[in-house]
Amino acid sequence: MSQEFLARILEQKAREVEQMKLEQIQPLRQTYRLAEFLKNHQDCLQVIAEVKKASPSLGDINLDVDIVQQAQTYEENGAVMISVLTDEVFFKGHLDYLREISSQVEIPTLNKDFIIDEKQIIRARNAGATVILLIVAALSEERLKELYDYATELGLEVLVETHNLAELEVAHRLGAEIIGVNNRNLTTFEVDLQTSVDLAPYFEEGRYYISESAIFTGQDAERLAPYFNGILVGTALMQAENVAQRIKELQIDKG
């Protein structure tokens, strides 16, 4: 995902937001708090399992998947949260996927999208998300804080995504409780787990860290387990012949 590509996505999002209606705020779906769960379950590397039909880097991944069944399989096998892609243009997702999955599982759901406006946050909450994604690279620090504060005031938790030390420092200044490190390089589109390992020395006590992207095997998970509370895994689970077995391989015992 080059910066040019990120810019294309954000231009598309701006067009979508312009046409988007401001929804009335509906009651927040009840489930456990992700940060609290991570705090109380640090003896295991937790898996955030993603429902993703396609991506710009890989193209179609699994277009025929029964999204609700996939999500329920994740839940049954101990996923801590389900991440749902809702971007239609670049990831072939849909807000309805979030709504359907959130109505059929009891664990938290994450709205995985490029959020740049309060209207998107309300839509996510109304569709059943209890956590949203905010990407440091997509927002000014001032705008990031505005959206973070707005989401938390609505009772949502926020996964703040970073890619390098400068962005990690922004997340720390923000006071983010749950911080993601995306292993995808925004300028080359390459992925490297070393990104997560290199940032680990800068992690702070009292926060919870999630490694995202390029995590496929138990070996990958073992490499990250000493530093992270959880991992976000999409493609490996969407392509797995045995989803339950793959999740178990990724749930590294840290005890």
UniProtKB/Swiss-Prot annotation:
InterPro entries: Aldolase_TIM (IPR013785), Indole-3-glycerol_P_synth (IPR045186), Indole-3-glycerol_P_synth_dom (IPR013798), Indole-3-GlycerolPSynthase_CS (IPR001468), RibuloseP-bd_barrel (IPR011060). It comes from the Bacteria. Its EC number is 4.1.1.48. Pathway: Amino-acid biosynthesis; L-tryptophan biosynthesis; L-tryptophan from chorismate: step 4/5. CDD domains: IGPS (cd00331). GO terms for biological process: L-tryptophan biosynthetic process. The keyword Amino-acid biosynthesis applies. Belongs to the TrpC family. This is Indole-3-glycerol phosphate synthase. The gene is trpC.
